[in-house]
Each structure stands twice: as structure tokens, then as C-alpha cells.
Amino acid sequence: MCASCLHNANAASFLMETFSRHRLNFICIGKMNIFYNVTSLDNKYSFHNPSAPVPHSSHALSSRQAHFTSFRAPVAPPSRPRRSQLPSSAKLLYCFDSSFSTEKRELMLFSMNFISSQTCVTFEENCSIPNRVQLVNGKGCSSYIGMNNIVQHLTFNDTCIDFGTAVHELMHALGVIHTHSRLDRDNFLNINLTNVSKEMMHNYAIFNQSTNVVPYEYGSTMHYYANISTMFPKKSEYSATLGIGRVTFYDMVILNTAYNCKCPNELLCGNGGYTNPSKCSECICPLGYGGVLCDRPSLIGKDTGLPLEVKDKIIEVKVVGIDNFFSYPTCLINGLEIKYMGDPRITNPIYCSADLINGKSFRSKLNPLLMNIHTLFGKNKVTFHYRYVTERLSGYNKTTNGYDNYEYYD
């Protein structure tokens, strides 16, 4: 069967009054378990004018993209602590500096509320306690890692006004390191330190005292952008996924594990979800799943319909073509993610270049199969063929991610 999906997502028209990172629309395509998920990103914090021509030159970068090419360079002093130090409790004290604009305050408060809605971590404004984070307008976007019993600066200038970057720096203050500083990072990245300047070298240091609690997540908001001369994923299909700034399911798992966030009674959440420690009556679901127990696709919108069950079948998708996708060093502007991997929680490769995905086929270990599109603005079109094959999912072995007990088809 063939399907063509067309979506006009001018985020400015319906999201300018919010700081929401995404808005979800699931549309049932055809008569199989395929769901098309449009994520319209909020361009209140994007540095892009939807009505202006989008540059195609790799040198014509927006402020935020230029910031990615410098890898969100921390500018803390050379004595910046390298060991992750968790705050003594799940409460982070902060104070807004007088230099911090109203817009940045609103974004930071929204980002804090997002983290609190997914974890047991809370934030309290307190400008008198020494052990606090002082949010200041300064050079670049940076934060110490963990708390150090001092008034420490979280620097957030005008190139940082973005939800993913705000969460990134707050997670640093909460003790979370960069993904590419994990002990096992060399299993997933090729890094050429000869091309890294001395002042940037600390950004590539491995934390020997760190503890991994989730699989390596190329899509994490804690991961820097890929650069062929310095850092590139060993799974090359992830080259445009690194650094897009999307806050992932596993990002919040890190915080919940680090702070031992739990509910008195655990719900039986489906599809890899888990009980929300901030609201114990519901589950936190991987992107694309909904319901109180994450037991169904998250259908939002009119006339979405219901899928025809094709139980125990592998679904195959072939992308015929993508149109009006803008390919930059990352899929920051827009991207297509086909959830074909067995773990519904992990970020799959995200594509925004027709040269890399047109004609490419995927066989999914998930049924139903989810397809995610995120976009800042514009009209994106995806045309694909899909079918189910005679091979059965139950013929595959089940495995776990090595960090928890949830099983999925390998």
C-alpha cells in the first residue's frame, strides 16, 4: 500500500503563546498499525522567521545552529569540577540575576516545571542560601555539574533561548553529565582529539566517576552535535540526530534513577512506560504512546480512526520520498523518525536529507509502528509504501536494554 502525508506546521500560528516544546497529532494511515506523529515545535525560541527564505548553505547558520557548532561550549573556569555531584536532596535552589530577562525567566520556569512534572525533582527560588544556582546572562550557555556548596552560575545568554538548551543546563546543575562523557562513549563515537582546541578539550573528557543508568542515547538533549572532524557516531545513520536538543524519555529516566524517584505503588505501564513519580496515578510514556497506562498510541485530533489489527506481524516501510525537509548539520529544523527498533523508548535515527532516506526500507520490531515528524515551520511531505510480511514477531528473541527488566523484540 502507498500513503502520502502532508502537514502544514506553522508553529507561530498556534504555539506562540506557549513554551511547549511539542504538540502532538497522531493520524492513522491506511489499514495497518502505522501512526504518523507530527510534532510542531515552538518557534518562539527558534531564531527562525517562518516567512523568510531558509538558507541552504551550511555557512548560513542561525544563532542557535552556530551555537551547536561550538558544542554548547561551557565557559566555567578551568577549575570547574569534573566529578558529578548530586544535590543533597531532590530540590534545587535558584535565583534569577537582575540581568536575566523576562523572556528567559519564563522559559527557565517552564523548563523547571517540565522536569518537575516528570520527576520528583523540585525547584525553589531562594536568593539568600549560599548553595544555590544563580541564573545569569553571560557568555554562552553553561553550568557547573552538580552542586558544590557555593553560589554557582548557570550562564544563559541570547543564543540559548531554547527549551532543549534550558533543560540541558538544568540537568547539568542536577548532576547529569554530557552523554558523550560516559565511560562507554568510545563504543558509540569516533572522536578525534587532534582537531579539538585546548580550551575545548574539557568538553570531551570522560567522567571516570560517572554511572550509566540508561542505554547510550544519541538523541539525548545532553549530547553535542556531530562533526565529521571531531566527533561522529559509529552508527552513521545517527549523524543528523545528535544535537537536535529534543528532551527524550531516557533523559528523564536518568533524573528519576539518580534521585530515586518512586511511587508507593507502581502501575502496570505498557510499552516501556513507568509510574510518574510526580503524579502516581498515571504513567510516563515513550513518545507516541498514550493513555493512563501507555497501552495505546496517543491519538489526538479529529477523524483519526482506529487501526486494523495485524497481530504478530512485522511491518515494513519504504520511504519513497521526503519533500521540503531542510538538512543542516543536524535535523534541528525538521526530521522524520521511523520507530523500527525493538525498544520503544530509544531515539531511532532521525532523517532530514532526501539523499539519505529516499528509497530506504525499514522493518519494524514494533507493532504498531510509529512514525514521528518534528518541525519548526513549513510544509513537510512524506510519501511511503508499507506492508506486513509473513515473518512473525514472535519468532524473534526478546531482550532488555541491560539497565532495567523491560523486554522487547531484539
Swiss-Prot record:
GO annotations of cellular component type: extracellular region
A GO BP annotation: molting cycle, collagen and cuticulin-based cuticle
Reaction equations catalysed: Hydrolysis of peptide bonds in substrates containing five or more amino acids, preferentially with Ala in P1', and Pro in P2'
InterPro entries, sorted: MetalloPept_cat_dom_sf, Metallopeptidase_nem, Peptidase_M12A, Peptidase_Metallo
Pfam families the UniProt entry points to: Astacin
Domain of life of the organism encoding this protein: Eukaryota
Known cofactor(s): Zn(2+)
Uppermost EC category: hydrolase
Residues holding Zn(2+): 168, 172, 178
Location (main, coarse): secreted
Catalytic residues as annotated in Swiss-Prot or TrEMBL: 169
Glycosylation sites recorded in the entry for this protein: 37, 126, 157, 192, 195, 208, 227, 397
Protein name in the entry: Zinc metalloproteinase nas-18
Organism, scientific name: Caenorhabditis elegans
